[in-house]
């Protein structure tokens, strides 16, 4: 084969691809992000308005799509959802009311058995950590579980599971399955930092 070849899409397997693509998307959509109506995570783009005016929302969607087209980036129509009042975005349900974990994930959490190995515990804590913004005092509640990891070496090593560990595990599961809806920030309300 002779000639010049170049990628028309991001190649799989290159370790720098996600960070490079994130940087590209942030650059391309910077004006919309700074205007406060667009959120981007790699190839997931969320465009939102604070009013129920479909004309305002359409204008913002068109502006974002124009910015993408200007940089020769395409959005696949079958992967797009338009004019939704509620949607799943990065593992959360986002609506005008706020942000909450996706109900299907909550049900899966209820079914998780107590971990038996270091690897299973790390997996559970990683999943719980993803939702930590919804879990008040998460680090204190999960302390017996994270302390258990300090005394281990390998992923297949069996855990020295105690009653305290079991109570912490059940409490974290309960917190995850009843995680509160996080309201969108309102600068007009009193703000408390804990």
Where are these regions (language model features)?
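Retroelement reverse transcriptase polymerase core
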Residues: 1-194
